[in-house]
Amino acid sequence: MAAEVIDMSRHKGAHPRIGATDVCPFVPVSNATMDECVQVARSLGKEVGEWLGIPVYLYGEAAVIPERHILPDIRKGEYEGLPEKLKDEKWQPDYGPVEFNDNVRRTGATVIGAREFLIAYNVNLDTQDIQIANKISGIVRDSGVVQINEKGEKVRITGLLKFVQAMGVYLKERNITQVSMNLLNYKVTPPHVAFEEAKKQAEKFGVHVTGSEVVGLIPKEALLAAGRFYAGELSEKQLIAAAVERLGLSQLNKFIPEKKVIEYMLGLD
């Protein structure tokens, strides 16, 4: 459907993307194993490449090539860099066409894989300065930043939060910036830990965190952990309410647990 209604040659956006259906992950939420998700991802990738004529890269646990395990590595260069990427032997797609033909010009590429549950989590800043958002992102993300030492050598300074990807984003419609994060393992770095660290770093730059948002769904346990951190032991409903309030999850759009918590959406509770 995305490939039918989105023409990538005319698409503009703030978030990195490589195609109309940018990424399609399979996650073992309930009654499924990671191996099963890997098999489904590879099977779908083959069909998308052969039947729809879209270049497909396999990532995460489904990656066949180790260098393609991490999504941002595949996205590097984004859609605009896809013509050159397809010419590079190291970046030939796992399935689908290897040339930037008219169909690929419209659809872009697709990244399909298997991974653990990822929380797309953005922290809102009361500044329009994207450089500040980028600096905070570099400090907190796992990969950190590359700096030049006194010898003129490039050295990587590791970030503060494990299993976290982050970048600064400017929201034109809101006139604010965000530290846009992917929490790759919320059991190691849950939302409230990322929120508090972003708040701490923001204060060093003279700006404030005003709230946050969850893009897509979130596991119930992540909210319960936040609720316990801020409010102690309460009922499930009260813990989730405390998490929503203290994380400012309704600042941009009202956070409705029944529509945002994956267990509630799937009827698992």
Where does each model-flagged region fall?
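Long, contiguous binding/interaction regions
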Residues: 1-269
